[in-house]
Amino acid sequence: SNVSILAAYSIFTQNFLLFCIANFFIGIGMAFTHQYRFAAAESVEKDKAPKAISTLLLAGIVAAFIGISLANYTKNFVSDYLYVGSYLTLAILTLVPAFLLFFFKDKRDVSIISNENNKVRSYSEFFSDPRFLQAITSAAFAYAVMSFLMTATPISMHIVHNLSLEKTGIVLQFHVLAMFLPSLVTGNLIKKHGYSKMMYAGVFFYILTILMSLFEPSYINYFIGLIFLGIGWNFLFISGTSLLVTIYKPEEKFKAQGFNDFIVYSVQAVASLCAGVFLNLTSWKTMNLICIIFIIIIVIATLRTDFLQKKPQ
């Protein structure tokens, strides 16, 4: 809340460095909200974790549309200082979860977690577990592909191919919708078909995304391609996160979750930063073809786990 006010103040004083610092700390705050999905998964039985995570991510639809609308509606609240009102609104919104968490009491038995005799595996031991590699690979490279292409989309559509900002905005809105709307059924599908099959389904939609990029770079092709991209991300990310929850022991959860998120969001950040560079050096079609590398890695990690599980002990 305070850093949102600081961001508003930096706009008011025209201090760009302070604005960057404020947004950096806003980003840190937003990173903590990603832990809510693990809290949701741990609040239910492990076989119900996929549905719990899906339900939580479904809220992203509301956030996507309300967030954009609120930002546009409040950006001119303070005349002559664009977006000061948006940041002040953000400061108020961040108080809502703070208020709810203030009254939250965890009544679960934490004796297992706090017991010093319980051995926590090292990072190398985590990596020796093929299921852990499958989970982290699915989530990380799902985010890499999605972020790599989504970040480049508005530049490719509006700057490179001269499509209107209105059409670009519609494509991105429906892409976000496709990222979260499948959450209505993803949890149930994982429970019915298993983690690996849902990961293969996510890969299938990523392949469809790449195929759409091979056609003429028209509005409708971007539109369909980005919808496939969103669905693929949903299947892969929720499957990977849900699988991770089943792997670690209670005393390992903080280490496993922290390490998972460090890898996933570091990979996403690098992919996002590289998007503009690659679009400038290559093309939209080439960027999509590059994503085949990440897809192959996901498939290999999943096939490896499936093979080892079927292999006689």
Identify the residue ranges that each predicted region occupies:
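Cytoplasmic helix-loop-helix junction between adjacent transmembrane helices
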Residues: 24-58
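A late C-terminal transmembrane helix in Major Facilitator Superfamily
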Residues: 251-281
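Helix-loop-helix hairpin linking two adjacent transmembrane segments in secondary transporters
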Residues: 18, 55-102
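Short amphipathic helix-loop junctions that connect adjacent transmembrane helices
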Residues: 151-167
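Juxtamembrane intracellular "pre-TM" segments in multi-pass secondary transporters
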Residues: 106-136
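C-terminal membrane-cytosol helix-exit motif in multi-pass small-molecule transporters
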Residues: 91-112, 301-306
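Helix-to-loop junctions at the C-terminal end of transmembrane segments
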Residues: 182-195, 279
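C-terminal ends and interior cores of transmembrane alpha-helices
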Residues: 1-14, 205-217
